[in-house]
Amino acid sequence: MTVLYQNRQIRELERLAVESGISEYELMCRAGEAAFKALLARWPEAQEITVCCGKGNNGGDGLVLARLAYENGLKVTVYLAGQRHQLKGAAAQAANACEASNLPILPFPEPLLFKGEVIVDALLGSGLSGEVKAPYDHLIAAINQAGQYVLALDVPSGINVDSGEVQGTAVKANLTVTFIAPKRGLYTDKAPAYCGELIVDRLGLSESFFRAVFTDTRLLEWKGVFPLLPKRARDAHKGSYGHVLVIGGDYGMGGAVRMAAEAAARVGAGLVTVATRPEHVPIVSGPRPELMCHQVAAADDLKPLLTAATVVVIGPGLGKSDWAKSLLNKVLETDLPKVLDADSLNLLAESPSQREDWILTPHPGEASRLLGISCNEVQRDRFQAINDLQEKYQGVLVLKGVGTLIKDESQAYYVCPAGNPGMATGGMGDILSGIIGGLVAQRLSLASAAQAGVFIHSMAADRAAEEGGERGLLATDLFPHLRVLVNP
C-alpha cells in the first residue's frame, strides 16, 4: 500500500536529501519543474499564467515555475506577497534566476488582477501553522473568486497537510502537485475537494530515503485489499463462509436490517439471519428469500440465534428504545465478533466500555457522541479523533466520511481514497456494516475486514456512480457491484 506522511516526516526526508548532496535549491528547481510539466500536461493550450508567491520556499517553487514558463514562451506575471529582500536562501536564489531572465517580480496590485488562463498558488504551502492571516486571507479569497483554473504547489494554501483541516480559508485548486511524498491530510476531510486532482512527484529521491523515515499511515488500494480476500476451496459449503446475524429494524426502520443483511450475503457470507421486529419479517424475507428472518420480541429470543452465529452486526435501524437496549446488552454478553453501527453506537456512548472483539463504525456525529465533543472538533483533526476513539473503546475503529479512516490496536492508520458525494444518502452505512460483517464471517481478522470492507464499499459506490451518476444514487445500487468486486 502507498504510505502517507506527516509534515515533520517530509522535513526529515528533505534533510536526508540535503545531507546526501542534493541542495535545497536543487530540490526547489525539481519541484518547480515538476509543477510546470503538470501545468503543460493539464492545460496545453494555456498562453498566459499568473504566479502568486509567498515569502517562503513554497514561493520559491512558484518562482522556479514562473521562470521556466517564461523561458518556454508563456506570458507570465509574478506577484510576491511581501518584499523582495524578505526572500531568503533557496527562495532568494530562485528570485535571482527570475531577474537574470528579465522576469520581473511584482507586488500584488490593488485591485487584484490575475492574467491568463491559469493561476498558480505558491503562497503558503505546507509550512502554515495556525489560521491564515492577512494579507494571505485576502489573496486566497481573490484567487477563489477569479474564475481561472488554479494549480496549487505542494498543497492548496490554507490546508493543514497533517489533518486536512481548512485553516480559516484555503485555495480551491483544480490541480495540486505535491512534492516528495503524499501527505496524509490531503486525503481526508475537506482537503480532497480543495486539492482537485492530486499528483505526487518524488522529485527524483531514491527509495533509500523513504525506507529511512517511518510512517504509520497507509492508503487503501486494490493491490493491498485483494490479497485479504480468501480464495474459495472447491469442496467448500455454506458453513465454510460463516453465519452473520444482523440485529435491528425497530418500528419503521426495517429496511436498514434488510440492506445490511443482503450486503453481508453479497460479499460472500455463507448464511445470513436477521433478527427484527415481527412486523418486519415479510419485508426482509419476502423479496430476498435467501435471508433467514426471525421475529424478536425480547432479548431472550436472541439466545438460539447467537448460538448459531459466527459474527453479529447490530445497529441498522435499531433505535434507542428499551427493546434496542436489551438486544445490545444481550449481544455484549457474548464473545462473538461484533460490528456496531448507527444507534448501537449512540447507546454505547451512554455507557462506554472497552472490548477487543468489536468493530465500531461511527460517522462524525456518532463519533462526537462517543467522545463527548462537538462534531466540528471531530472533523478538525480526524486522525486525532480516531486515535482517541480507539484508545477509549479499543477494538477496530472506522471513522466514516470523506477519506474514511480505519485504526486498530496495531496503531496504524488506513485512509480510503475512494468514494463520492452520491454516497450521501440513507442506507449507505447499513450496507457498510453488512459488508464488514460478511467479511468477518469468512474468517478475515477484524482489522482486515474493516479495511477491505471500507474499500470495497466505496469502490462499489464509485462504480455505481460511473454507471448512472452521483445524484439519485441509492444504497441498494451497490449490490451488483459488490459481487463483482469480491470476485476479481
From Swiss-Prot:
Chain positions recorded as (6S)-NADPHX 2 binding sites: 317, 430
Cofactor needs: K(+)
Cofactor annotation comment: Binds 1 potassium ion per subunit.
Region (NAD(P)H-hydrate epimerase): 1-214
Chain residue ranges for the region called ADP-dependent (S)-NAD(P)H-hydrate dehydratase: 221-488
Catalytically driven reaction(s): (6S)-NADHX + ADP = AMP + phosphate + NADH + H(+); (6S)-NADPHX + ADP = AMP + phosphate + NADPH + H(+); (6R)-NADHX = (6S)-NADHX; (6R)-NADPHX = (6S)-NADPHX
Domain YjeF C-terminal, chain residue ranges per copy: 221-488
Source superkingdom: Bacteria
SUPFAM superfamilies (UniProt xref): Ribokinase-like, YjeF N-terminal domain-like
UniProt-listed CDD domains: YXKO-related
List of residues binding (6S)-NADPHX 1: 136, 154
Entries under InterPro entries matching the protein: CARKD, Nnr, Ribokinase-like, YjeF_N_dom, YjeF_N_dom_sf
Binding site for K(+): 58, 121, 157
Enzyme Commission number(s) of this protein: 4.2.1.136, 5.1.99.6
PANTHER family the UniProt entry points to: ATP-DEPENDENT (S)-NAD(P)H-HYDRATE DEHYDRATASE (PTHR12592:SF0), ATP-DEPENDENT (S)-NAD(P)H-HYDRATE DEHYDRATASE FAMILY MEMBER (PTHR12592)
Described function: Bifunctional enzyme that catalyzes the epimerization of the S- and R-forms of NAD(P)HX and the dehydration of the S-form of NAD(P)HX at the expense of ADP, which is converted to AMP. This allows the repair of both epimers of NAD(P)HX, a damaged form of NAD(P)H that is a result of enzymatic or heat-dependent hydration.
Protein name per the record: Bifunctional NAD(P)H-hydrate repair enzyme Nnr
Source organism: Coxiella burnetii (strain RSA 493 / Nine Mile phase I)
